[in-house]
């Protein structure tokens, strides 16, 4: 039973993205954990600091920080409004940097502290930038935080890693914003990312840091051999996610 603070803006149901911080908290508590739902705009410096302080006070400290907040717009440069550019950078890059920054004093007191970004490997291939430059810049900003903070915090024993899915993941965002039912059927369940993240947090923070992990490859390294349980629909070819390097090969049988 983990103690989990859920810090996000969604206090009221969104017409296209189901669930709120409160429904997520209910699910955590039904599973045997303790939850602290906090309404937080990751662009707001005071709100982020307050959320971290409240979490540490409620649970007696902070062991893990997951930077998952993200804004997406898959538009090319002429079609990207500057307010959308700013939003993506404020949430993805700045939000990740700021949350990590203010978490450091709390994490320094933890026994096995981890920061995990849900962000991709830094594969500097033109094909990831040309179709949606603004989004890629913002998303890679999160990954640059991994690269820099892993080195900066290594001497303090704080691990900083990135985790990214090989395939699309069946979330409300995929359903309503990216590909509808067809893409959902070609996706994996969120549990693959949850299992991979859990495996990361069990690692020795002093030794396991600065890694850019692809979900199935990492789980395979941890001894997982059965990946069919993560599929939404058996027999439907899985849709690849953005940003997975061509050099990253799936484990044997993982995509079958």
Model-derived features: positions:
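Hydrophobic positions on the long internal alpha-helix
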Residues: 51, 66, 99-103, 107, ...
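Catalytic loop of short-chain dehydrogenase/reductase
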Residues: 108-155, 164-169, 179
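A glycine-rich helix->loop->beta "capping" turn
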Residues: 31-36, 54-67, 73, 159
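C-terminal helical subdomain
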Residues: 162-163, 181-256
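Conserved glycine-rich Rossmann-like NAD(P)H-binding loop of the short-chain dehydrogenase/reductase
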Residues: 2-23
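Substrate-binding pocket helix/loop in short-chain dehydrogenase/reductase
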Residues: 76-77, 81-86
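The beta1-alpha1 cofactor-binding region of Rossmann-like NAD(H)/NADP(H)-dependent oxidoreductases
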Residues: 19, 39-51, 82
């Amino acid at each position: 039973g983990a103690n989990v603070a859920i810090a996000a803006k969604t206090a009221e149901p969104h017409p296209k993205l189901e669930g709120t911080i409160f429904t997520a908290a209910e699910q955590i508590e039904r599973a045997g954990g303790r939850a602290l739902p906090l309404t937080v705009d990751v662009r707001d410096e005071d709100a982020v600091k307050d959320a971290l302080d409240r979490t540490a006070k409620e649970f007696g400290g902070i062991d893990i920080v997951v930077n998952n907040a993200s804004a997406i717009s898959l538009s090319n440069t002429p079609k990207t409004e500057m307010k959308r550019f700013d939003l993506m950078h404020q949430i993805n890059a700045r939000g990740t940097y700021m949350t990590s920054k203010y978490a450091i004093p709390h994490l320094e007191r933890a026994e096995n502290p981890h920061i995990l970004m849900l962000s991709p490997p830094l594969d500097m291939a033109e094909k990831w930038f040309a179709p949606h430059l603004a989004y890629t810049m913002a998303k890679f900003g999160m990954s640059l935080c991994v690269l820099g903070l892993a080195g900066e915090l290594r001497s303090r024993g704080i691990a900083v890693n990135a985790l990214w899915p090989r395939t699309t993941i069946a979330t409300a965002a995929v359903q309503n914003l990216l590909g509808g039912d067809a893409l959902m059927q070609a996706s994996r369940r969120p549990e693959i990312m949850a299992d991979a993240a859990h495996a990361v947090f069990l690692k020795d923070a002093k030794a396991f840091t600065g890694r850019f992990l692809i979900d199935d490859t990492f789980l395979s390294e941890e001894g997982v051999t059965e990946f069919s349980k993560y599929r939404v629909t058996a027999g439907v070819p899985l849709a690849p996610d953005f940003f997975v390097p061509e050099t990253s090969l799936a484990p044997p049988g993982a995509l079958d």
